[in-house]
Regions:
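N-terminal secretory signal peptides
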Residues: 1-29, 43
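N-terminal cap/lid segment of alpha/beta-hydrolase-fold proteins
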Residues: 64-99
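C-terminal catalytic histidine-bearing segment of alpha/beta-hydrolase fold enzymes
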Residues: 257, 262-304
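Alpha/beta-hydrolase active-site loop
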Residues: 156-180
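N-terminal twin-arginine translocation
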Residues: 24-32, 41-65
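Alpha/beta-hydrolase fold nucleophile elbow
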Residues: 182-192
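Short beta-strand element of the alpha/beta-hydrolase
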Residues: 104-112
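Short beta-strand/loop motif that positions the catalytic acidic residue
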Residues: 236-238
């Protein structure tokens, strides 16, 4: 089942086009990825042609890899443990778990559209090093887990085929697992890009167990209503140069105000989409360091 094109399918499509326009992937790869998301060759070609007409995009294959000298924001990551736990309808969910020595709280980590990667494991371990026992859930557990795919474009396409209701159910099950592993701890959630959108979706679905949430540059679901998550203090993280996601920033603030949730919207200057990912081409060390400190301060205020 393909998602509603007006929501996450559109978001994932725009991510591919943006990667092409920024020169991160070439035309052939962009066409391949758009096709995997269900676009016809004609539509995919027209989207890339619009970038070409604007003087953007790369017909050749660009350089790939992590920017030289990238240092992740925050402390050195604790090691994570691969775990399985009970999910909805007798399904088994996969995840990465990192326990803090003296937990101040517990955090659910939601991955980007590349799945449960080493980068997300690192974020999970860094949060544990900062005092928050953390669990990153693999939202492709039913498909065999992220590790069962050899191509990140296949991961994105697989995520695109899953109904949002299953994602929400799996995230709620992961919160239940956190309750078991971190007894009496207040629980927060953080997600990045696609995962940021998932945090918004979790809040909109209603999750009273959340005491804090921090969606990083994630798309806001249409008609989001956060009344069912009355206990969540929400830190919305945006990037100054991320016009695509920033288009929903005002609506997010309005929805938070309407639900009367404690919240703060922060936009980091001179930073683009995915600026926190130290393995990506848009990594901004200064913005990432500031965002991590802001996140830990937020959790400190609302989790302990």
């Amino acid at each position: 089942m393909v998602k509603d094109v007006t929501q996450f399918n559109q978001y994932l499509t725009e991510e591919v086009v943006e990667d092409y326009s920024d020169g991160i992937i070439g035309r052939r790869e962009a066409l391949r990825r758009l096709g995997m998301l269900g676009l016809t060759a004609a539509l995919a070609g027209s989207l890339l042609a619009a970038c070409d007409a604007a003087g953007q995009g790369s017909a050749s294959e660009p350089a790939t890899g992590t920017p030289a000298g990238s240092v992740p924001a925050g402390p050195s990551a604790r090691s994570t443990e691969s775990i399985t736990f009970a999910g909805p309808q007798d399904r088994k969910l996969q995840g990465a778990w990192a326990a803090a020595d003296n937990p101040r709280g517990a955090v659910l980590v939601i991955h980007e559209n590349r799945g449960l990667t080493d980068h997300i494991r690192s974020v999970t371990g860094r949060l544990a090093a900062s005092g928050y026992s953390s669990l990153a859930v693999d939202l492709l557990s039913e498909e065999g887990g992220t590790a069962s795919f050899t191509d990140e474009a296949e991961v994105t396409a697989a995520l695109n085929s899953v109904p949002d209701s299953r994602f929400v159910a799996d995230m709620k099950a992961a919160i239940g697992e956190l309750e078991t592993r971190a007894v009496d701890a207040k629980i927060g959630a953080v997600g990045f890009c696609f995962g940021g959108g998932m945090v918004w979706s979790l809040l909109a679905a209603g999750e009273p167990r959340l005491a804090a949430a921090a969606p990083f540059y994630g798309p806001l679901p249409d008609g989001a209503d956060f009344a069912g998550s009355p206990n969540a203090a929400v830190l919305g993280v945006y990037a100054e140069q991320d016009e695509r996601v920033n288009a929903t920033r005002e609506k997010a603030a309005e929805a938070l105000e309407k639900a009367r949730l404690t919240h703060e919207i922060v936009t980091f200057p001179n930073a683009g989409h995915a600026f926190f990912n130290d393995t990506g081409q848009r990594y901004n060390p200064a913005a990432a360091a500031a965002a991590y400190q802001k996140l830990i301060d937020w959790f400190g205020s609302h989790l302990g």
